[in-house]
Amino acid sequence: GKGRVWMTSRVRIEANTDACKAGSTNSSANYFPLNSSSRHASYFDPDTEEMTLIDTCYSTHHLQFASDADDTLWFSGDTQAIGWINTRLWDETGNELAAQGWCPTVIDTNGDGEITKPWNEPGQSPVAGRDTRLVGFAYGIIPNPRDGSVWITRTQPTPGQILRLDPGSNPPFT
């Protein structure tokens, strides 16, 4: 690591810009647009004594680094999606939109081994043969260094959930 202290911070008002919505250059925005985020990312660099704010399209709460070549920083804290920052890409480009990604939590309920749209949405009558999207406040998050998956806890719906997210080789599409 670079000795920075990463944290979550409020960077702006909740309404997301068009960069977080369909038509954006960000693949996550086109795959699963987000309209708002209440808390974002930041870090303090002790060497320069500077604070850097990073606007994220997803809300953040808890954060954890993965053991991967991109020094991926995973975030819980959104009810609709799980987010990440590719800190290697951030360091190379300084482009907050290009360095971030997110995806919804969708279960392969049709059993075909892939997550495909359209899926069953929360609160709607399920359609047979579709995968199912889950929502709820994502509280804790921990990457698994053995297989690259990410484990999250959800506080809602009661009594809560423990979910394993496999980002695949081309997130958010896999």
Where does each model-flagged region fall?
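Surface-exposed loop and turn segments in beta-propeller and other repeat-based domains
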Residues: 1, 32-58, 87-134, 173-174
